[in-house]
Each structure stands twice: as C-alpha cells, then as structure tokens.
C-alpha cells in the first residue's frame, strides 16, 4: 500500500494551461514526489487523442479542438463534467497499464454504485458504461513510468456537443450522465466520493488536499 495521495481541486479551468502544467509536473517530478490527482472542470472543448482521426470530428462548430498526447480518440469536456488527472508514479505503485486502467474503472463503478447506478467496463473499449451508454471516458499517457491525463465523468452537463463527434471514435455511441440516472446531483459530493474510491482502488493509505496553484 502506498502512502498518501494528494488532491488539488482546481474548479473551472481552461484546458490548455492545465495540459501544460501536467506535462511540466510529469517532467520535473522526482522519485520521491508525492502522487497527485487534479480535479477540474473545463469550458467547452474537444480533445483529440493520439489515435484520433479527423473524420470523427463531425461538426465541431464554435467549440475549439485541441490535439493532445493522451491515449484514445476524440472526446468532449464541458462544465458539469468531473475531470480527474492522475499524476502517478506507476512504476512505484507496481501497476501495469492495463491494471491501472482497470483500477480506475473500478473506482468509477464503485462511485456510481454509491448512487445506486449499476455500471460496467468493457475489455475492448476503456471507460465505464450504463446499459450500453458511456458515462465516463479514460485516456492516459505513461512517460518514464509516470502517468498523466486521466478520466472524465459526466455528472450534470449538456450532452449535446457529443453529437458533433464520434465519441472515442465510435459512430453513434450513446452518452449518459449521472443526473439522468440518479436525479439532482451535487458535484461537490461527487468529488468527495470519487476521491474516496480512487484512494481505495489505487491502494493508498490516506489522502490529503493540496493547496497552491499548478503554475
């Protein structure tokens, strides 16, 4: 079991500065650096992963498109979606990539179960699904044994922009969100429950809230 996992709650932040901060953190961290998870919402943005194809951006319209270095294909971020960036020393944790993905999926499934929503993962399509509709997306990058990027959970948001793309490269993939499955949801409470599930499933002994910026 690892020691302490630090969380930063960043509120609503533009995507690109957070992306650059993740890269800097990953490049500059030492073998003794504490693992961190950054909890954030983004203004409307499409992000294209390394496997993304231009034809999966159907009608982006006025929503910006950002090319990223995470795994996966195109997805949408917007207010009311809880994003968590996992800045972990995966080598120190002793996880392979597949195990890390599975542990993140199990944390999300556990969170949803706490709202009486039964969800599952698919071995051939990372993420978490409810009755075939996707509620959470995953996209990671591992560099020198350290992870960055992470997960996006649809909580209480406008899902319409997902219709402008083929989410994760799948034409017609249905998307859902926690509000539509469990009624009115407080995002603060979702964050608290998500923190607990990530600490549990990533096998940390405790958690702490980190203060200060990410510049």
UniProtKB/Swiss-Prot annotation:
At which positions is substrate bound? 70-77, 137-139, 150-152
- InterPro entries, from UniProt? aa-tRNA-synth_II/BPL/LPL, BPL_LPL_catalytic, Octanoyltransferase, Octanoyltransferase_CS
Q: Does the keyword Lyase apply?
A: no
Listed NCBIfam families? lipB (TIGR00214), PRK14342.1 (NF010922)
Q: Where in the cell is it found?
A: Cytoplasm
Name it.
Octanoyltransferase
**Which pathway does it serve?**
Protein modification; protein lipoylation via endogenous pathway; protein N(6)-(lipoyl)lysine from octanoyl-[acyl-carrier-protein]: step 1/2
Q: What does the further note read?
A: In the reaction, the free carboxyl group of octanoic acid is attached via an amide linkage to the epsilon-amino group of a specific lysine residue of lipoyl domains of lipoate-dependent enzymes.
- Residues the UniProt record annotates as site (Lowers pKa of active site Cys): 134
Species this protein is from: Pseudomonas putida (strain GB-1)
- Enzyme kind, highest EC tier: transferase
Could you give a GO molecular-function term held by this entry?
lipoyl(octanoyl) transferase activity
Q: What does this protein do?
A: Catalyzes the transfer of endogenously produced octanoic acid from octanoyl-acyl-carrier-protein onto the lipoyl domains of lipoate-dependent enzymes. Lipoyl-ACP can also act as a substrate although octanoyl-ACP is likely to be the physiological substrate.
Q: Which Gene3D superfamilies match?
A: Bira Bifunctional Protein, Domain 2
Please give the SUPFAM superfamilies that the UniProt record associates with this protein: Class II aaRS and biotin synthetases
Protein family per UniProt: Belongs to the LipB family.
Q: Name one GO biological process term.
A: protein modification process
One protein family per Pfam: LplA-B_cat
**GO (cellular component) term, any one:** cytoplasm
* Catalytic activity reported: octanoyl-[ACP] + L-lysyl-[protein] = N(6)-octanoyl-L-lysyl-[protein] + holo-[ACP] + H(+)
HAMAP family on file: LipB
**Catalytic positions?**
168
Q: What is its EC number?
A: 2.3.1.181
Keyword annotations for this protein, in alphabetical order, are:
Acyltransferase, Cytoplasm, Transferase
Residue intervals of the BPL/LPL catalytic domain:
31-206
């Amino acid at each position: 079991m690892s020691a302490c996992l630090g969380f930063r709650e960043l509120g609503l932040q533009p995507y690109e500065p957070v992306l650059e901060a993740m890269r800097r953190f990953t490049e500059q961290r030492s073998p003794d650096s504490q693992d961190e998870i950054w909890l954030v919402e983004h203004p409307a943005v499409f992000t294209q992963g390394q496997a993304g194809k231009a034809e999966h951006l159907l009608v982006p319209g006025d929503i910006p498109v950002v090319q990223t270095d995470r795994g996966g294909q195109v997805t949408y971020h917007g207010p009311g979606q809880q994003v968590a960036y996992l800045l972990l020393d995966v080598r120190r944790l002793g996880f392979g990539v597949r195990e890390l993905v599975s542990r993140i999926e199990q944390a999300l499934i556990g969170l949803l179960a706490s709202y009486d929503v039964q969800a599952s993962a698919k071995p051939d399509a990372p993420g978490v699904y409810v009755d075939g509709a996707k509620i959470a997306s995953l996209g990671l990058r591992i560099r020198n044994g350290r992870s960055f990027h992470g997960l996006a959970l649809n909580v209480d948001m406008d899902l319409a922009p997902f219709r402008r793309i083929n989410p994760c490269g799948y034409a017609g993939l249905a998307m859902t969100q926690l509000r539509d499955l469990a009624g009115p949801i407080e995002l603060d409470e979702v964050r608290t429950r998500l923190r607990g599930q990530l600490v549990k499933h990533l096998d940390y002994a405790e958690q702490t809230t980190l203060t200060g910026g990410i510049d």
